[in-house]
Amino acid sequence: MQNETASHGINFDALGRDRQSLDLASESVELEVPGLNLFYGAKQALFDVRMNIPKQRVTAFIGPSGCGKSTLLRCFNRMNDLVDGCRVEGEIRLDGHNIFAKGVDVAELRRRVGMVFQKPNPFPKSIYENVVYGLRIQGINKKRVLDEAVEWALKGAALWEEVKDRLHESALGLSGGQQQRLVIARTIAVEPEVLLLDEPCSALDPISTLKIEELIYELKSKFTIVIVTHNMQQAARVSDYTAFMYMGKLIEFGDTDTLFTNPAKKQTEDYITGRYG
């Protein structure tokens, strides 16, 4: 399969990342999924998903619309709890602890596992207050602590130099790409362990998309990142590992280079080469 899939021009080195040899089996595990099923009412949406998400790596979920990739992503911080009729069977373990166990503090889980959505969603507040929002909820109000957190998070989101002189202006005045980086700053300000990105570039122009992709590459030194994307070129550029999903099932999961150039499953090859999807 190698020649055919490689001929589709997937560019693995657009970000200049280190193409080191990766071995999923030897990675430290951040999120463990030993068997997960999910139902919306009587309809099953995820079927016995089993995977380990490696620590401080970028894992991409790809697959056609409706394949379950965003549904699975939202399981990792229990956002599906907010969907009427949604029911989960099985476990997801964060640092060895089942996030669906009784007594789990869901608010604390969502601090540890932050999420950025498709459309930038800054609050109608100042740039500064957007970044410190989660910290204030935690009862942190000392100005020095907040000031340091704002600078750290905005630098981490590659936005500090663009906004440092207008921190108290409305976040709604930022461009779409800047707003998305602000949302990332707001998410990392509470120092999560995992960042979930649900098609974070789908509403952005190519220049803003490149900035987000470069940011993802920088952030993985501090955070475990899981990204859902419809853009296979993007998955190839930013991720270390890629999972291909189809009709609620995990078809193939492995290092990105191998999955795109020499997939093990015919379904994966068909999707990558554009035969369906």
From Swiss-Prot:
Residue ranges of domain ABC transporter in the record: 31-272
Record flagged with keyword Cytoplasm: no
Tree of life domain: Bacteria
Known EC number: 7.3.2.1
GO terms, molecular function: ATP binding; ATP hydrolysis activity; ATPase-coupled phosphate ion transmembrane transporter activity
Membrane topology: Peripheral membrane protein
Transmembrane segments: none
Keywords from the named record: ATP-binding, Cell inner membrane, Cell membrane, Membrane, Nucleotide-binding, Phosphate transport, Translocase, Transport
Catalysis: reaction(s): phosphate(out) + ATP + H2O = ADP + 2 phosphate(in) + H(+)
Entry's Gene Ontology cellular component terms: plasma membrane
PROSITE patterns: ABC_TRANSPORTER_1, ABC_TRANSPORTER_2, PSTB
GO BP annotations listed: phosphate ion transmembrane transport
Enzyme class of the recorded protein, top EC level: translocase
Annotated positions binding ATP: 63-70
A Pfam family it matches: ABC_tran
KW Cell inner membrane (keyword) present: yes
Main location: membrane
InterPro entries found in the cross-reference section: AAA+_ATPase, ABC_transporter-like_ATP-bd, ABC_transporter-like_CS, P-loop_NTPase, PstB-like
Described function: Part of the ABC transporter complex PstSACB involved in phosphate import. Responsible for energy coupling to the transport system.
Family of the protein in this entry: Belongs to the ABC transporter superfamily. Phosphate importer (TC 3.A.1.7) family.
Subunit structure: The complex is composed of two ATP-binding proteins (PstB), two transmembrane proteins (PstC and PstA) (Potential). PstS is missing in this species.
Name of the protein this chain belongs to: Phosphate import ATP-binding protein PstB
Organism of origin: Pseudomonas aeruginosa (strain ATCC 15692 / DSM 22644 / CIP 104116 / JCM 14847 / LMG 12228 / 1C / PRS 101 / PAO1)
